Amino acid sequence: MNSENLIRRYVITGSRRLSNYWWASVVFLGAIGFLFTGLSSYFGQNLLPFLQVQNITFFPQGLVMSFYGILGLLLSIYLWLTIIWNVGGGFNEFNKKAGAIRIFRWGFPGKTRCIDISYSLKEVEAIKVDFKQGVNPQRTLYLRVKGKREIPLSQIGQPLTVEEVEKQAAELAKFLQVSVEGL
């Protein structure tokens, strides 16, 4: 067996997805629009050339629009920071050479910024597949470890098809030489 077949690494995207960039940008632009409209009504001048604020009084419309603009900016800053920090991003590494499994994720800054979990391959009991149907279907792969809880391996985002989840579970179970549960 060559070294390529001894190590498998699955990259987890985290918050650096196209949809997060899209929503952070849309919220930012909308918030700027609301804030400039509110400030324009306060000063009585058009701060942006395409705004006509003569019919908007500062109290209550301009004040409320300024408030919404500030809240939108705060939400936009939060979204951009999660993208910059890559919250939820990381990898799952299965290393037969070292006999170890390593699950790594980035979190928010602080004491638990890096979540780095390691287990021995001998501790793995099974790969579990969980299907939840409904309005928001979830298809998740779990690593079941002896005496411990189930550790999610799937990334959050667009749900995979049932076939893709089954294929991933079968490949990983074959590589780790354990059984698949939940199919």
From Swiss-Prot:
Cellular location(s): Plastid, Chloroplast thylakoid membrane
Gene Ontology process terms (BP): photosynthesis
Function in brief: Seems to be required for the assembly of the photosystem I complex.
Main location as per UniProt: plastid
Keyword Plastid attached: yes
Underlying gene: ycf4
Species the sequence originates in: Stigeoclonium helveticum (Green alga)
Family membership: Belongs to the Ycf4 family.
Pfam families: Ycf4
Keywords: Chloroplast, Membrane, Photosynthesis, Plastid, Thylakoid, Transmembrane, Transmembrane helix
Membrane topology field: Multi-pass membrane protein
Transmembrane segments: 23-43, 64-84
Protein name in UniProt: Photosystem I assembly protein Ycf4
Entry GO terms, CC: chloroplast thylakoid membrane; photosystem I
Keyword Ion transport: no
